Amino acid sequence: MKKNLVERASKIFLRAEKEGRNFLLEPEVYELLKTYGFGLPRYVFLKKGVYPAAGMLRKLGGEKVVVKVVSPLILHKSDVGGVMAVKATASEVKAAIKKMEKEVPLKFSRNSGGKARPEEVAESIQGFLVVEMVEFEQVGFGSELLLGLRVSKDFGPVVTFGGGGLDVEYLNTHLKEGHSLAILPVAGLTEKKVLASLEPLAVFGKVAREFRGRKPLVKAEELQRVVQTFQQIGQDFSPFNQTTAFTVEELEVNPLVIRKGKPVLLDGLARFSRNKLELEARSAAQIQKILEPQSIGLIGVSEKMNVGHIILNNIIKNGFNREKIYVVKPGLETIEGCRCYPSVADLPQAVDLFILTLGADQVYPVMKELVEKEKAHSVIIIAGGLGEKSGTKSIEDDIRNLLLGRRKEGQPAPVINGGNCLGIISVPGRYDSTFIPEYKFKRPEGLSAGLAIVSQSGAFMLSRMSTQDRFEPVYAISVGNQLDLTMGDYLNYLKDRPEVRIIAAYIEGFKPGDGWRFYQAAREAIKAGKKVVVYKSGRSPEGRQATASHTASVAGDYAVAKSLLLQAGVMVAETIKDFENFIKALILLEGKKVQGQRVGLISNAGFESVIMADNLKGEDGALSLPQFRPETVQKILQALQPLGIDRLQDVHNPLDVTPMADDAAFCGCVEAILADEQVDGMVVSCVPMTAALQTLPPAETHRENIYAEDSLAGRLRKIFKESEKPLVVNIDAGRLYDPLCDYLEKNGLPVFRNCDEAVRFLRKYLNLQRL
């Protein structure tokens, strides 16, 4: 059955292609949709010069019809008067056709600024589509829906569903993010997850759920079905599907309406091509060579302290065996105790890793020799400007073609990291190939975090390592231009590494199709119990330029990336600060158990209780505030009673203990709430200026001591260690209280400096970790 569908659809594309088109006319769009079983209005296509008979119109039913011009030049018919609603009589339809034949060419020519002459437009008109006027449910917002499919250059085909009609862009801009549009991959989601992706949409609730006493206009499963059928079309004609000749670049229905409980697809457009993408994955064995080499070669090392020499020193200082370091340096016997060789060809063996630090114009000759002489299994190209400075793109292309030719012939070819990268730091590999001097960058020390950082920007990578210097990454990988190895390659490798438990990625852009590989690898990593955090830059409105469809306009590249990564279970950070906080908190919460999304909130300041409650819901999920069990309420009252706070405040969630609460009262409440069976996680927020709490290190001016066992920090440390539930702390204060924050974090508690950040993290954590 499926094969028959694909064959029938392919014939439609082939017919259009033979006429020199890469898009379908609307009658052909109807034919395609009908092939896949969609509900359509009754219609008839009249070739130019043909007018309808009365009997033909009666078969359409109804008193009115819609007449639409059909031309390969005219995609937006309404803009040029190419759509008219008239009575369903032969005379009215003929008059409408005559009117459009006269006026549409003139309007189109005028709108094009004279680029298309009226005679050319008139010649392009192939006929007119006469469609029954569908009487559909009119409920205001939500009456018209949008269903789209498009090929994202990063992720391949994606399906979009949301509000439709003429106000698509307006609604998408003004509705809260996550409530205007659902963006779904064409594969990898169960029926349950497809439905869960539609549930948050404002239009879905309006038409598929009871609304102010009105019964649903359509069953949720009906909308789920049309979305899944579009997913099927996306799979059948995907750029990744080599079994079909065509790729559906774009398919859009706007509007989709509801008639008598069934979806009916009214207006449609489609673009297609023969473009196909081969997703060529690098082998794990080759990537292991670059991350855990047994031998390293270098070129570009001068006797003076240049970039290459700094890299050599960093490699040696990280404990790599000098006897397995080979430097290409004519005229020298040794440098820094490492053997030198006159040329690449003279290297005594094929090294696992070769580091190339020459200028961009010298890269290709060295790469050619490395490849042809088979002297390296992997290469890091540090060269700055490669692929960015004008004239260097051809160098990258030459290197790609060199590798591609070897691989197609089945000959050995190295994998390449870079170019234009800062290098790699590998603890298992015992090397640091970055070119930052030791005195300018203090390597993170202390907690071995099971963390791998993969970043398109080396500077971003080092900045995050500098600010999070309490946690030592297993790997820190600056991928640069992704000339060969990509973000998807690295994630696909790291997901299977037992020493890696958290993967943090900074992404500016994916190579074509690599976003899909990244998405799949992220899903597998998360299913295996790992955590993945992503900060994605490049958020300009990519798809908002003039385009043939609304789908590309409202579902730009960043929106697609964010939506799919969230569905994979990735923690998507909106800010750099969130990115840092998420990494820190994930490391410190390792081993805590996630049971649900019920949270307990506590603060000694009323404003924080309000702000925390404001952040319970987001597009990544929601937290609920359970009522405390009676025994919990009793324990809280007992903790507050000695200070008389029980007479000032009722016990509810969030709990405001007031600035009067001392260390014992505050932490007694924390302990009671965290022990409650109704609570799955907790935010402990403290404004530390109150004299009632010990929040400062010892000094002559006061008697406080944050290091004491009975202090706030001492008590929280004990509570945190004894509970399996995730708990995060917020200290909303300035540098005076940095010692308190540092002490808490050294003892394993994740600390935030704003309560909204703390709640936002816990919301993402409790929702995404359960996937």
PLM regions and their residue ranges:
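Catalytic-core regions of core metabolic enzymes
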Residues: 1-771
